[in-house]
Amino acid sequence: VRTDALTSHLTPTSLQQIMNDIDATLKEAYNATSTIVMPGSGSYGMEAVARQWATGKKVLVLRNGYFSYRWTDIFEQTGIPSETIVMRGQPTDNSSTPQFAPHDVDEVVKTIQREKPAVVFAPHVETSTGIILPDDYLVKIAAAVHAHGGLFVLDCIASGTVWVDMKATGVDAILSAPQKGESILMFYIRAISLT
C-alpha cells in the first residue's frame, strides 16, 4: 500500500520543498543573497520594487524600447517617485530601419554622478529593440549609483537564460517573471540592508 499516493502537490511539505528548491536554484544561478517568489504579474513585481525603494525619491530609468517604458508608465500612474529622469536607447544610424543601442554608458554615468538618483532602473534585455546590456555596462552603472548610496534595479523579465551574476556586476535587485502569474525578485546584500 502506497500511503503517499494521495499526497497533493499542495500539501504544506510538498509546497515548502518546491519553494526551497526554487530559492536555492535562483540564489545559485544569480549569485543572489535573498529571493522572493510572489503572486502577481511582472508589472506587479515592478510596482512592488518601485514602492519599496523609490517612494518619494528621484529615480533614473534607462529606456531601451517599448517594454522598458513600463517603468515610466507605472511611475506616471502611481506617482511613486518624486522625480523621474529618462535616458533612451539611441538609433545607430539615420536609415529608415536603424539598429538601436543603449544610451552611451559614459553619459549615463555622468548623469548618475550629477543627478544622484536614489534608484536606477534598467532593462537587461529589451525585446522590442533587441538591446542587451553587457556585464561591463552593468558594472559601470552599479559603481556610479553605489558611489552616492543608491540602488541598481535590473529588469530581467526578457532575459531568458542569460544569467546575471549579481555579485560580479553590482546589481542590487533583479526582477523577473515566468509569465505564469508570478514575479520573481532577487536581492543582493545592499538591497536587503535598505529595506
PLM region spans:
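Conserved N-terminal alpha-helix of the aminotransferase class I/II PLP-enzyme fold
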Residues: R2-A48, Q52, R70-I74
